[in-house]
Amino acid sequence: YYNFDMSGIWIVEGTPDLRPEKSHNFTFSAEYAKPRYNATASVYYNHVQDKIATAAPYYKKPGDKLPYLPYVNLADFKVYGGELGLNTRWNNGFSARFTYAYTKEELPTDNDGNSINNQYIPARAHALNVWAEYEHRWSKLYRTNFCLSGRLLSATENREYVDYYDISKGTVKVKYPAYTVWKLATTHQFGQAVKLSLALDNLFNYRPRYYYLNAPLTDGINFQVGLSIDIDKF
């Protein structure tokens, strides 16, 4: 069965007696549509029994150099939430989309109320995504498109080891702050053959305080330029 040395931190070890997961998922959704508007709403509840995950690391023998991280079945795991969405499109070239999502996870906890399974950063409870676009054809030979998109995510907390190479130092609660990332992009089409693309990614130059797991992998604002030419359309 599985036995893997994870970069000298610990040995991830499989368990032959694992039970299969059982999941019960319930979803309710509704949609309302008109010629220029579309709205959606949904709620869900997912209950997983015997969820397979990693337990707390431990030393098998006093002389072991690396701790073992075994796979186990969690007694109970629940996640629930909902999403609201709105899409609009007007005849003047403007269109927009907004979505809001709420997510709540419930993991088993120890006697101190700490999550016993923190192999990943917990989901951020609130997430808002925004997308807006304007498109206009100025003539038969020139068309432009402008698009602004962004996401806003709430803060979250996770309990992590102070030193992954020395788990005897214990754990500490780490807060991952809320953040927002935006992108502004524009395309300019000349005739049928030439298209110029320009973009500013991470528009407000956001940099995470620390990079870990699902933190955004960005080191600041990024400028992008692209040019495509379809030779067969000249």
Question: Predicted segment positions?
Answer:
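Surface-exposed loop/turn and secondary-structure junction residues enriched for glycine/proline
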Residues: Y1-S7, E21, H47, K51, ...
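Conserved C-terminal beta-signal and adjacent last beta-strands/turns
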Residues: E21-F28, A101, Q119-F234
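Short strand-coil-strand connectors
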Residues: A33-P35, N91, S139, G191
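Surface-exposed extracellular loop regions of Gram-negative outer-membrane beta-barrel proteins
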Residues: Y1-N25, Y45-L69, S154-D163, N205-T218
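Generic structural detector for well-ordered beta-strands
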Residues: D17-R19, N73, D230
